[in-house]
Amino acid sequence: MRPARIIAAAGLALALAFCGTGAWTYARARGDDGLAYGRQRDAALTDGRRAIAVLNTLDASSPERARAGIRAWRAASTGPLRDELGRTEPRTGASARGTVTEAAVTALDPRAGTAKLIAAVRVEVTPAGSKTPTTDRKRLEAVLARTAAGTWKVQALNAVPLARTATEEDAR
């Protein structure tokens, strides 16, 4: 055999071994329960962050925009929270823009389709007739429910009390 054929055969064998190892690794990862759990956790976190930002945002500069904001709230929520938000009357007034700065899934039950999420939210509130917003920081806990479409929506939203720091206690 010529050296060129030996090198080509060795290269082909090496390529086949590499492809076989890749296929075997892919097949194992595809059926990995931990990987599936991680994907669901990531989906809950992504959808939950988006929904919490929506639920802390409202442009109330006009009745039409307030109505659109309330529709967005309803689209981001489910269950009793959605029903409660549906009873909200659109009014003009202060506008708010919520931004989720940090969030984490604290509990996930893929079989039941429920999750809990904690989030730190920065809310910029602009009073009606003012150009200067004030900033407020909130910590929230959300209970999420997976819908039939596979998306996660907020079922309950509660404020988490902030602990006072030593500096704040000294200021009192």
What do the PLM-derived regions correspond to, one by one?
Residues 37-95:
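Core segments of small alpha/beta cavity-forming domains
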Residues 94-130:
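Surface-exposed, charged secondary-structure patches
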